[in-house]
Amino acid sequence: MKKIVLLPLTLLIVFGAFAGELAKGSQLYQKYCASCHGVDRAGTVAPPLLPLFLKKIPEKKLIKIIKNGLPATQMPAFPQLTDQQIKEIIAYIKSPAKINWSEDRIVKSIQINKNPKTKKLPVKNIKNIVAVVERGHQKVWIMEDLNILDKFDFKNVHGGLKFSPSGWKIYIPSRDGWVGRYDIDKGSFYGKVRACVYLRNVSLDRTGRYLLVSCWLPKSIVILDAESFKPVKYIKQDGLISAIYELYSKDKAIFTYRDKAKIGFLDTKTFNITYENIPEPYEDFFIDPFEEYVIGSSRKGTRLSVYSLSENKEVFSSKMEGMPHLASASIWYKKGKFYFATPHITKPFITVWNLYNWKFVKKVDIGGNGFFVRTHPTTPYLWTDNGKDKIVLINRDDFSVKTIETKKGKRVIHTEFNGDGNLAYVSLYNKDGDLLIYDSITLKLLKDIPASIPIGKYNIVNKSRKYQPVLLGKQVFMEKCWGCHHQTQEAFAPSFKWIVNHRKPEEIAAQIANPEVMYKKLGYERNAMPKLNLSSYELRAIMSYMMQFKDKKDAKNN
């Protein structure tokens, strides 16, 4: 009986001591920390101090930070605090907190530059602009070709930048809920708003009018006016959203959950949400270029699944070895087929699959644990990383592998291309890292720029979903049309530019599909165009590419 009585007593003593430590920590926090980190620890001028943000930081490091401060972030030192007091503060900030978030707090957080210092950036082609996240210095660079056109600060910048439909505005999220905007056409930082306390990702509706923000704390989708930053709709959620992505072909956005077996469909006009059940949660996913399927994987990493948006059901599932990192997958076209390649977290290989018939093609050993796969029609390679100091290049024709040495002991991570695809921007992910810029065809190193933890690079052509069919269409053009057509100059046949500015899209599609029928309707005496026998996906891809050469009324409109 004594043991039965003593055990609860022991627990009560321990719990009481811990509760006392938390109470002391709370008092110390309010006295020394609340003015910057917020009374409720949600953050104000300094980041939030909550378990989500602190769980990976060792206690020894936190003690050092509080005692000595962080000069780089203007956090003061607190040498007057004893080690015991600091430990009490740490126990408190690592304890659960109740966060009261509201639309009113979002409105109060809005900061817009009323009189920004503008400057004209020497932009030659907006489609070749690359935004670089330098996490170590909490900066974003605006680049074109080999040149840095501007830099600006953004605290706790993580990645996941999004471009407006025109490409002239960039939206920058931080994990602690802030979303900022930089205007390339004015060369200035427009302003920022705090949508939530812990942000997952941001997207824009296809018009660019609304920002769609998925949040983990509080669990919500926050819809903001992209110009005023004011909240338009606050939608509470009861699960952790994996990500939210817009559709370019209709007024919808799609999101999934890490912890719920559902797909959500947000109407970006009415903001109503409908749900469909799936067999298990999609922790990671991407939408195919023609917006017919969602390709997803679970946190368990055991299955690759394909969900049909027209049939509202899963149409394919396959066992996997290692969780595919589908948000980092890459898509291309070759000899009548569409492919995608995905890295696998903690596994030393990538896998290649056919899009649309969902057949496994090949496992390619990359010699280490990779995280990203990128490609572009201009380069013949898949560019990937393996956690080491070499860039891994996989030939798209035969899947042979070769490497490029960078700097010994550094870590290669993430490649991105400019819009033309002739330049590859590669990060060396170290505090004393670098941004390396290569010719994507010759593989010659063109420039080495020192950078502190450069991570994501973002380009409107490679990161905006509306351009995915365009890039595939360029590859269809090179294989099927290049012998007779030029994009802008008359060759054996009219240029794409002439065609799209003189014919209706339905006439163009009909001629490609049935040239032996359409030549008379178009006023030709004979048919000189061969029948290409394109699949519906090939036809949609080449049409998307051709329409890029249509004259635009607004020179700044992409």
Residue ranges and their predicted role:
Residues G25-V39, I89, I93, V140, ...:
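The canonical Cys-X-X-Cys-His
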Residues A46-P48, E525-P530:
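Short linear capping/connector segments at secondary-structure termini
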